[in-house]
Amino acid sequence: MSEGISLSAEFIDRVKASVKPHWGKLGWVTYKRTYARWLPEKGRSENWDETVKRVVEGNINLDPRLQDSPSLELKQSLTEEAERLYKLIYGLGATPSGRNLWISGTDYQRRTGDSLNNCWFVAIRPQKYGDSKIVPSYLGKQEKAVSMPFSFLFDELMKGGGVGFSVARSNISQIPRVDFAIDLQVVVDESSESYDASVKVGAVGKNEVVQDADSIYYRLPDTREGWVLANALLIDLHFAQTNPDRKQKLILDLSDIRPYGAEIHGFGGTASGPMPLISMLLDINEVLNNKAGGRLTSVDAADICNLIGKAVVAGNVRRSAELALGSNDDQDFISMKQDQEKLMHHRWASNNSVAVDSAFSGYQPIAAGIRENGEPGIVNLDLSKNYGRIVDGYQAGIDGDVEGTNPCGEISLANGEPCNLFEVFPLIAEEQGWDLQEVFALAARYAKRVTFSPYDWEISREIIQKNRRIGISMSGIQDWLLTRLGNRVVTGFKDDFDPETHEAIKVPVYDKRAIKMVDQLYKAVVKADQDYSKTLGCNESIKHTTVKPSGTVAKLAGASEGMHFHYGAYLIQRIRFQNSDPLLPALKACGYRTEADIYTENTTCVEFPVKAVGADNPNFASAGTVSIAEQFATQAFLQTYWSDNAVSCTITFQDSEGDQVESLLRQYRFIIKSTSLLPYFGGSLQQAPKEPIDKETYEKRSQEITGNVEEVFSQLNSDVKDLELVDQTDCEGGACPIK
């Protein structure tokens, strides 16, 4: 393999001298605590210029033409492209996904082929492991096993991804009868540092257990793969097809699992110890044993996935993100979170949605659930399979392998397929002098290269090679349209009738300038993909564009999140920090208000006054003032003219608008591919992440801030390695992984 593409120090110095990053009010702080990796040789975490260099070099070197003796002309061309990308990302006119900001260009990326993708989807049905990095020793590669989709989910969650999974009736019906109840004993050596804590959650001392001819013993290696294989073995022993010897006793030895607080060298952070795994294994075994002689239900399968997600949360740089997709007439699935005990124990681990098609009409109970607790969400698989952008019309089977979606709902996915995201802030890019068509072309090429990663799972490799799906998103959409047009995209509504139900409806009227703007950019993305695909000799991407929810990444640039309206014209935004976080002294020195977090010990809540882009515009609207009808209409606009994948949106509604949910879901059934809704809470919760304030309060609080956090932090020189990242819900639905 040839020497890779690298960016020179001279070039980076020129960019730093000429380009100012468009940090939002929380931008640099959010970057430093979330995406700046530790540099052991320098005894500090990365600076922004170093992060962008790592990220861009990690991506540009995925171009497959670099594998074999590339010409000087090719290397020069790719170096120039890397320089354009560097300048774009450094200025925050666009960014790759948060996953890429954290992982791209690291040894972990080079070792772990799946590491650059945010989220995945898997169907919960027996599947073959195939030629994957993880294959249980007792299985042939082509042998179907009940454990496989659970192993896939567990593995991808531990790599930091989110996973959508389908427990629709068509999948669950393929799972055979549970043949055996398994006597599971989890053991830990009495000399282990984790012994006492492990016994408290159900393990026993190793010397207390006697192996016999009827038992299977497995000592887990201290690896991610070891955790996955232990769970796979446990699941598969319950089924005669994968337990031909009819063994009914399993001893899992967790003595080698590193203790709580030990360093995780690959993904980063510190270990949780074996305790969450012990609890997970015992709980999953109970779910399966309870169905011995019978069949698993969609709720059982979702419980297993949720228990896995609960265990994975126990790391300091991950939040387990799951979306459970069930059948729309499966009342047990729809109501599964009403069991408060199980909700508190593990069912919180997924957002739940139901699959519908455009002929579906049973929205009344769904709307009732949404008004009560914001669930279920809606995923229209019929639209996803047969439409790109809605304006381009019906295209039978254009995405025919689609079975579900990622946890945030912006990408329709086939079994084993991942999201592959890049985000453009069009207003910021334009202000920095960029031609938006070039920006979106660079974005498409960046995402295309990610599809050439060496994926760990066979199902993923095969579908990625076929689809080469990319998801080029725009964020700060409300900022851009309001600034460029002087008004919001929905200019009004006109009276009409539903063509099938003949119900009276209000049809949105869109600003035609906005239609032209997004249509031109969509075509620029498609053209860039066509050209690059031809150059690389690979399939064109099956779909290209999306709108992602963009919580953390939008904070970097200070933009509105995806298509969402700002939560308020003026806000107090709160971020929680571990008390030992070196950013805290700098924030206090600069005048930011801080107080002890009332929800979590050893945590400090810091308040940031924020003014939304366009707050003074008379046509500005916030999530607290914009109507539910306009939010639906805005999502429909983007699904019609911009996104050929889907549009992630959490529509917020006031109590007085709850009775509109059912009719609006029905009205947009031919347009919107996925959506979720939540009641608007304003700032009513104590220490709420976002609290709307008035202009006077904003100006008063802003005057209290007297310093630049980045400069003060540098002067204090107090960086710390492996800090715990305190969890916060950055996207409305809480579905996104932190990174």
From Swiss-Prot:
The yes or no answer to whether the keyword tRNA processing is present is no
May I ask which residue range the UniProt record assigns to the signal sequence?
none
Recite the UniProt keywords alphabetically: Allosteric enzyme, Cobalamin, Cobalt, Disulfide bond, DNA replication, Oxidoreductase, Redox-active center
Q: Does the keyword rRNA-binding apply?
A: no
Adenosylcobalamin-binding-2, as annotated region: 685-724
Q: Name one GO molecular function term.
A: nucleotide binding
> According to the UniProt record, what class of enzyme is this?
oxidoreductase
Highest taxon of source: Bacteria
Catalytic reaction equation(s): a 2'-deoxyribonucleoside 5'-triphosphate + [thioredoxin]-disulfide + H2O = a ribonucleoside 5'-triphosphate + [thioredoxin]-dithiol
- Region called Adenosylcobalamin-binding-1, residue ranges: 565-626
Tell me the disulfide pairings in this chain.
Answer: C119-C419
EC numbers listed for it are 1.17.4.2
**A Pfam family reported for this protein in Swiss-Prot or TrEMBL:** RNR-II_ins_dom
Region Effector region-1: which residues? 147-158
Q: Where is the active site?
A: C408, E410
Picking any one GO biological process from the record gives:
DNA replication
Known cofactor(s): adenosylcob(III)alamin
Concerning SUPFAM superfamilies, the annotation shows: PFL-like glycyl radical enzymes (SSF51998)
Family, similarity comment: Belongs to the class II ribonucleoside-triphosphate reductase family.
The protein's name in its UniProt record: Adenosylcobalamin-dependent ribonucleoside-triphosphate reductase
Q: Which organism is it from?
A: Lactobacillus delbrueckii subsp. bulgaricus (strain ATCC BAA-365 / Lb-18)
